[in-house]
Amino acid sequence: MDNVRKKNLLSPAKVIAAGFLAVIAAGTILLSLPVSHSGKCEVGFLDALFSTVSAVCVTGLITVDTGAAYSMFGQVVIALLLQIGGLGITSLGAGFVALLGGKLSTRGNSIVREALNYPTYSGIRQMIRSVMVLDFSIEAIGAFLSFFVFVKDYPVKTAVWYSVFHSIAAFNNGGFDVLGRGDSVGMYTHNVWFNIVTCVLIVLGGLGFLVMRELLGMLSAKLHGREVGKLSLHAKVVLMMTGILVFGGALLIKLTEGSNISVMGAIFASVTSRTAGFATYPLGGFSNAGILVICVLMVIGASPGSTGGGIKTTTAFVFVKRLVSVITGREARVFRRKIKDEAMSQAFIIVSLAVMWIL
């Protein structure tokens, strides 16, 4: 009987997929309700479905302007969908259980481990709790800092909501905005504070919770006079790739666009292109070369266990290492450690599938 029951249980990956499908169905129903619509423009079932899928998958693509088409209720629904999409339905559910002092089953631990790309089964409950606290703390700080931008252009109550929504959308790499202008966040193209806050939120969300937790642990040890441990190999690769993609991407965008974009605009475009989807400069104004750079950044995306998508920075790194290894005939190594053949094969398969799907 137990064997039959085990066979009938869905794998962690299937449970995660089923959870997302359930959230998409619920979100579509809620956004289809009249209470979710502002009445300023028509919102059909397909618009509601598209908005839901885009929010849960944190892509930032829209068929109707979020700020103009949806009421406050609809915008709250989208914000929740962005939060679920960034954290993951299983991680979010398990996080509330952990925060309330509950215990996760062995199966629950397995599902969360799969969702967050956690390497072991030990300390999962504590890890989930820290992820939840870290997530909401960063979003709260982001909302507070964003408020000083929006309050200059909108009434206080409106500025508060715009700040909260923007912080959630930025940290979860969602790309949605509720300004209702139709040009994303173009009105803040030259606002240095807005650009900095938004970029920091996007980058933090794209690093991955395990890397952020590791960095905070090192900072805490330093402040309390304890011995500071070394960064894990995963964290080193993620931080290195993030720096290369952000500044390398910005340099290429600036070189391809020249005087048509400022240095700040190039950095913002490089950061947001990887997974977020905000725009201070209209994409239609970019050259073909600039769009190609943006496309490469979009394919690579964020890091494992983060709020963003893409093939992941670590996969791109291992893939490039594999290519260099084949060309030079040398063993693929990273920070003096040999890269496993299995990891290189997985990276090659992921990149190949991504390219075939796009083409």
Language-model regions, residue ranges each:
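Membrane-proximal intracellular helices of multi-pass ion channels
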Residues: 1-359
